[in-house]
C-alpha cells in the first residue's frame, strides 16, 4: 500500500523531525510512505476573508498537483468525521479491499484547506474539535497510521 501525506509548510523543529523520522521508519514495514511538503503562503495580519480564501486556493492548487488520479483522498478537516483508532484502521483496510492501493492524507496550513481540496476528498476526517499546529499534527497522523497497521496485523500496541 502507498501512503502519501501532503502537508502545507515545512517542519523546522528538530524534535518533530525526529518523531516523523521514527514513525516513517516504523511504517516502512507496512507501506510505502511519501511525505510531501508544499509551500505555505504568508498570511498578513488582519487578513480579510477574501484574502484568506485566496491563500487557501493557492495552497490548495499546490496540494492538488500532488494528488494522483487513483488516490483515495482523506482530508484532515475540523468539520470531518471523528472516529476511533479501530475505525480508522478499518477505513485503511477498506481502501485496500476495494482496490485503492494509494491513500493521500491532506493537511492544510493555518487557514485550513481550500474548497477545491475538500471537494476532491473521498473522506473528511477530524481528530478533534480542537485546533492543532499543522506541524505537530503530522506526527499525530503518522502515529495513528502506524497504530492502524498494527491493529490490522493483529500486533500489540500500547493503548
UniProtKB/Swiss-Prot annotation:
Entry GO CC: cytoplasm
Role summary: Specifically methylates the pseudouridine at position 1915 (m3Psi1915) in 23S rRNA.
Protein name, UniProt field: Ribosomal RNA large subunit methyltransferase H
Enzyme class at the top of the EC tree: transferase
Xref: CDD domains: RlmH-like
Gene name in the database record: rlmH
Annotated keywords: Cytoplasm, Methyltransferase, rRNA processing, S-adenosyl-L-methionine, Transferase
Binding annotation for S-adenosyl-L-methionine: 76, 108, 127-132
GO MF annotation, one: rRNA (pseudouridine-N3-)-methyltransferase activity
Annotated EC: 2.1.1.177
Amino acid at each position: 500500500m502507498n501512503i502519501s501525506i501532503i502537508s502545507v509548510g515545512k517542519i523546522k523543529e528538530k524534535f518533530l523531525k525526529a518523531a516523523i523520522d521514527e514513525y516513517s521508519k516504523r511504517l516502512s514495514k507496512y507501506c510505502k510512505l511519501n511525505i510531501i511538503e508544499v509551500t505555505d503562503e504568508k498570511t498578513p495580519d488582519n487578513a480579510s476573508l477574501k484574502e484568506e480564501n485566496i491563500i487557501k486556493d493557492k495552497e490548495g492548487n499546490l496540494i492538488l498537483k500532488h494528488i494522483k488520479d487513483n488516490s483515495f483522498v482523506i482530508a484532515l478537516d475540523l468539520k470531518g468525521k471523528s472516529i476511533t483508532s479501530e475505525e480508522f484502521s478499518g477505513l485503511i483496510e477498506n481502501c485496500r479491499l476495494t482496490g485503492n492501493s494509494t491513500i493521500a492524507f491532506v493537511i492544510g496550513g493555518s487557514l485550513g484547506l481550500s474548497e477545491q481540496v475538500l471537494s476532491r476528498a473521498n473522506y473528511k476526517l477530524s481528530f478533534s474539535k480542537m485546533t492543532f499546529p499543522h506541524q505537530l499534527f503530522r506526527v499525530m497522523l503518522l502515529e495513528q497510521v502506524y497504530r492502524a497497521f498494527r491493529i490490522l496485523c493483529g500486533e500489540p500496541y500500547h493503548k
